[in-house]
Amino acid sequence: MIPFFIVSHNNAFLVKATVNSIRRFAPYNVITVLDNKSTDADSLCILNELKSLDNVIVRLYNDNTGPWRVIREQEFCNVRTKPFILTDPDLDLTKLPLNTLEILTKIQHKHNANKVGLALDISQVDDIIKGTYNHDVTVIQWESQFWTNKIVDHEYELYSAEIDTTFCLHNYSYPSRSIRVGGDFAVKHLPWHMSFIDSLTANLVARTFYNPTISTTSKLIWKYKKIFKAKDFIVVSDNQNDAFWGIYNGWETETFQVFDRFATMSQGILDIGSWIGPTVLYNASRYKHVWAVDADKGAIKSLTDNIEVNNFQNKVTVIPKAVYHRSGSVSFGNNLFLANSRENDSTSQIYENIEGGKMTECLSFDDLIKENKIDNLALIKVDIEGGEEFIMEQLLKYSMRTKTPIYLSFHFTWWKTKDLTKYVPYFLEFVCGDVSEQIKLHPFISILMQPKY
């Protein structure tokens, strides 16, 4: 019986679907999964499950040679002396006729061709992702070339076209000739289809199609889903902040130097004013845990999406509340001092005794710590657009008591009282000393405040 070989790399959910489809019309044929050094935990788990199936072999390799292992490697020289089928796992094989193997073998013998495989269906034009795919052309434009050179055959729809890994029957006893079979044997290449990509979570998309610099398909999908690479994590665009992520890798470098200075996998970090997550996502892989606090609903949505896409759910706790001098509710909205301020643009702020905004649940700093059982902190980062005025006393007392450093962004111009004198005694308990004049001279300044030991 003709053996099957499926190429695998961090996409085992597709491999599993392909195995199940093949077993529908070839239940007794041996299926070998050739895994090219998968690192994704879910994929490795699925591959382990597949090992328990009858007639399914899973080979785990320590290198990634792409799809060419069966065709080129010495270990498969005996395999190449007989017919075999090689395929990628990202095809929809669910509708193939039950006599597929018989028909492909018949066509191969009839037309004296060493490679006969399935054509890729591009008839659902509206469902295929738009944009540049390969050599500056779209998927439709690229794939159309394989549907032009029709072979005369009164039984089947055949085309002379190169083919290797799209469910291709290889038999090197025949002369070098490649044929794609259309009609009932044309199948979808799933990653090209919006309906398929949209059915996946952003996290699964990013994990499966993770290399847009090499893979034309991954590049196409990342553009469609608006996925960006930022430092050492992945971002899914919320459409509003694309420009920010475009400059992110050079944004506030001194802030990240502070994060790196205190980074430790034995302690956490409290991020008050987390916005869409530029600091949270960075620190999720550098600290034991991140508590992310923000009251902007739009920002929280973007943040939680990006926590999911990076699989940081167990590393980050999101607290969608404002932090204030008391617990309860407070008016919160667009920045009063910036005419172009809007939701989810990093400048939202608390309205102190001013009409406007939306009533938002808030916690005092002390209650924030207590209710969320926050402890063992290496650093506290605060950037809340003037709202630091309302939590300064509780924040500084906590820092002094626990000896926790604070990286505090002052927005003194936006303070209500413009009075720093009452904080001077606290400032003197920190290594930086009295920073009052520094804050007045530079109304928008971030200062590292380390308690004296």
What spans do the regions from the language model cover?
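Active-site-proximal specificity loops/subdomain of glycosyltransferases
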Residues: D42-F84
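Short beta-strand-to-loop acidic/aromatic patch adjacent to the donor-nucleotide binding site
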Residues: R80-T94, L379-K381
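Short, acidic, metal-binding catalytic loop of nucleotide-sugar glycosyltransferases
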Residues: N20-N29, N310
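S-adenosyl-L-methionine
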Residues: L220-L363, K370-I374, T413-W414, ...
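Short internal loop-to-helix segment that lines adenine-nucleotide cofactor pockets
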Residues: Y248-L270, S329-S331, D345-M400, W415-D419
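A conserved acidic beta->alpha catalytic loop
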Residues: L34-I46, H325
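Conserved catalytic core of nucleotide-sugar-dependent glycosyltransferases
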Residues: T65-C77, L93-G182
